Amino acid sequence: MSFEENYFKDRKYSAKEDLVSRHVMEVLKWASKTAHTDLLNGNGKRALDVGCALGYTSRVLSDLGYETIGFDISSWGAKQAKNNSCSQFLVCDAQVALPLALDSFDLVTCFDVLEHLACPEKAIRNMFDVSKGTVVCTTPNKKVERLIRKLLWDYDETHINVKTLAAWRKILAVTIGEGFILESFYDVAFRLGGRLFFKSIRIPTYGLTVRIVVKKQR
């Protein structure tokens, strides 16, 4: 499975920066409220963007004030991310031991990555280990993802590990024990007159996207 230049071009990823950025902000607002912590003020804090792709999330984090490091398994993606942002970017696999110090990041983000991984539980454990604060992830919901994405002509065959909320709860309980919350949402986005309209709607069980927030217990 390759996540190099052709993958991003086939997915028209370069045209999605404003959509990705809006999605990231909505999820961080939700996670801040849910975990009772201010993730929108990154001044004096460090953030890690797991699966940074072209660096759109990393740029949002940097704009919020975080000292940001991003990494991706794609060398091409990490190179583009470095060109798009002033953040630091690495090439590595989230499923293996990360070349980063334990308990060193106030915020770890992982947006729409877990579904691509053969062993997402290893990635979750690695993210938890390097975090000293909050881990925020999003991933498609198996209950509805294949049907809706095919109807929208947007299904990604590299989604090899799509799970339900119940399945993620079991994985998180085994992997990190406690301190996590999951909810499902459906994001509605459309353009009108050149302006992007974006609305997140919480739909229990059947939302298209599973949101995960983990607050590390000290």
Over which residues does each language-model region extend?
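Short N-terminal helix/helix-N-cap motif within the alpha/beta-hydrolase-1
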Residues: 118-122, 147
